Amino acid sequence: MLRAIAAAKKKNDRIDANKICDCLRCDFLPVCYMASTAIRERRRTLRYRNLLVRQMVQMKTKICTLLMAAGVSYDKERLHKAGYFRELLANNPDINDGLRSLLKLCRETLVRLSKTESALVRSLERDPLLMERVKRLMSIPAVGPITALTWALEVGEVQRFSSIKKAISYCGLCGDQKSSGNTVQRTPLSKQRNKHLQTTLIEAAKMAPRYNPTLAQLYNRERQKGNVNRATLAVARKLVAYLMAVDRGQTHFLVLDNEERAAA
């Protein structure tokens, strides 16, 4: 109906309002979930933290760009460490006064952003509304504070998902399909998703096989099929299943041995 309104030949506010009212009267409009005010405020803080992280990356990239533009050689693995950076500015003859002032400004901005980001994360971890929930989620191997906070604040009430498949779809970890006649197009990931959750879960899935043997087996099994990205997505989907189970049951994550699984 809404697509018909958008493509109508005669279109004005009165006609559109009448059509929308008819849809509402017939219960054709889907219900939109709205998180509580407390969750929205804390989610705003977490998303602001993500902005600070992007700015930190920009500052690090700018420092590297300035050094390369001036032909200064440096150790990229130690560049952003405080001691090495001070030594580089003090002893390298290729760095003139103008470049040195810009590099110091970038470094000061980077340190300030890092301190602010750490303070925001600590404040969310110590929040009484989130503390117990985050601790339970962090009991899952490979789930750290950022992944736990992102899940808790972006999902809100986990009971609104009736199945794991719906949660996976909300996180954007499934493909999209567009078909017309005999033509079927599939995309690796759907664009209709929560992009904050999608990014965090994919990044967590890249590190998860190092900390969780079960996820490592899943990753290796999927990787043998020839696609590394599909293996990462499979791990991310399994993480969603773990997060939903812990969040719904309100219990810590338990790892069962093979003997206990057989007995169960």
Name each region found by the language model.
Residues 28-30, 59-63, 117-118, 156-160, ...:
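Short helix-capping/linker segments at secondary-structure and domain boundaries
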Residues 10, 38, 75-78, 103-107, ...:
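Conserved phosphate/pyrophosphate-binding and hydrolysis machinery centered on Walker-type P-loop NTPases
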Residues 8, 136-139, 145, 149-224, ...:
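Phosphate-backbone recognition surface of nucleic-acid-processing proteins
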Residues 54, 153, 199, 203, ...:
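Short, residue-level hotspots on alpha-helical faces of the histone-fold
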